[in-house]
Design a protein with these regions (language model features):
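Transmembrane helix interruption/hinge and helix-loop junction motifs
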Residues: 1-5, 59-69, 108-110
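Interhelical loop and helix-boundary elements at the membrane-water interface
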Residues: 9-55, 73, 77-108
C-alpha cells in the first residue's frame, strides 16, 4: 500500500471508528463526570477504553503492524479524556488523532 492510499484508509478508518461505531450513548457513557450514564452503562473507563481499543485496532489493521494498536488506543483514549474534561475542544481532539495517525504512518514506512 502506498502512502496516499494509507492516508486515505486511515482517514476512512478514523471516521468509521470515531463516529459511525461510536453511538451517542457511548460518547456519553465514556464521559468521566457523567453520573447518570454510570448508573445506566457502568464505569466510564470501560467505554473509554473500549473506544480507544477499537480505534487502535482499526489503525493496526490498516497499517499492518500490531504494535501501533496499543499506542493509538492509549493516545486516542487520553485525547478523548482531555476533551471530556474540557481541556481541549472537538477540533483539537480531531487534529490530535490525525497527527498521531500521521506519526505512526511515518514511523512504519521509515
Amino acid at each position: 500500500m502506498g502512502v496516499l492510499e494509507a492516508i486515505w484508509w486511515l482517514a476512512v478508518g478514523h471516521v468509521v471508528s470515531d463516529f459511525v461505531l461510536q453511538p451517542e450513548f457511548m460518547a456519553n457513557a465514556k464521559h468521566p463526570d457523567s453520573e447518570c450514564q454510570r448508573e445506566k452503562y457502568g464505569p466510564w473507563w470501560l467505554w473509554m477504553g473500549g473506544h480507544g481499543i477499537m480505534n487502535g485496532a482499526v489503525t493496526a489493521l490498516i497499517l499492518g503492524v500490531w504494535w501501533v494498536g496499543p499506542i493509538e488506543a492509549a493516545h486516542h483514549a487520553l485525547t478523548d479524556w482531555a476533551k471530556c474534561k474540557g481541556h481541549v475542544g472537538f477540533w483539537e481532539d480531531q487534529v490530535s488523532h490525525a497527527l498521531m495517525k500521521g506519526l505512526l504512518l511515518w514511523i512504519v514506512i521509515n
